[in-house]
């Protein structure tokens, strides 16, 4: 749930994310240090385990003094200027991960593969922009692919709500059956979009469906004058990280125990691209 806070010298937009036990400062203007005491107090009151600030780069030293540490960078997040994802843990267990080196090896293995340039091929299935009457099939797709998910995509009403806001979905169909989807969550005020909600039914994997969907979303974003895009991929997923790498995205760091997705609380890799 997004909330705005205002105090002397600063305004900030906070995502109070109870499901993922975190608070995110997704944007701010002014002296962020003046808002930090209230943010930390709210996080402790809500039993949040992690505070995340999408920090403007000149504020990194200020946040470091307040016990925040960098976990990655989002290129172009603030109207073409990078944001440093700085975090402060309020739970020792939330800070710990036993899969870090294994996930490093996944990135190293991907880097050893030569980038595959996109060609003019077309998907073997039907691809189109989703409409509101697709929300039921979309929710069923996400239920089949993910055991848990950080946002309420299992609820058709939530999908409809996002469609009517600033989220664009593209889908892939085998005749009338929805088999794959991806979305772009647009932030027109900050000039970026997040490629997210990527899902493919297991029996349809291996056809590069996600790559086609991402390419379609990128074209849509370019048409809206959005040139900076990013995506968060499960650090344990070779396939999704490889798709982003071969789609021209650059690795930007790893967010530890970032959100509940698929098998539980997972690390997420940052990938960024300028269109």
Curated annotation (Swiss-Prot):
InterPro entries: Acyl_CoA_acyltransferase, GNAT_AblB, GNAT_dom
Induction trigger: Up-regulated during sporulation, under the control of the sigma-E transcription factor (SigE).
Top-level taxon of the source organism: Bacteria
Enzyme superclass (EC): transferase
Keywords recorded for this protein, A-Z: Acyltransferase, Transferase
Molecular function via GO: N-acetyltransferase activity
Pfam families associated with the record: Acetyltransf_1
Catalytic activity, EC: 2.3.1.-, 2.3.1.264
Gene3D superfamilies assigned: 3.40.630.30
Reactions catalysed: (3S)-3,6-diaminohexanoate + acetyl-CoA = (3S)-6-acetamido-3-aminohexanoate + CoA + H(+)
Domain N-acetyltransferase residue range list: 125-271
Application of this enzyme or protein: The use of YodP from B.subtilis for N6-acetyl-beta-lysine synthesis opens the bottleneck for the large-scale production of N6-acetyl-beta-lysine to investigate its properties as a compatible solute.
Disruption phenotype: Deletion of the genomic region encompassing the entire yodT-yodS-yodR-yodQ-yodP-kamA gene cluster has no noticeable effect on growth either in rich or minimal medium, does not affect sporulation, and does not cause osmotic sensitivity or influence the compatible solute pool of this soil bacterium.
Keyword Acyltransferase applies: yes
Task performed by this protein: In vitro, is able to catalyze the acetylation of beta-lysine to N6-acetyl-beta-lysine, an archaeal osmolyte produced by methanogenic archaea. Its physiological function has not yet been elucidated.
Family: Belongs to the acetyltransferase family.
Miscellaneous note of the record: N6-acetyl-beta-lysine is not synthesized by B.subtilis as part of its cellular defense against high salinity.
Protein name in the entry: N-acetyltransferase YodP
Organism per entry: Bacillus subtilis (strain 168)
Protein's gene: yodP
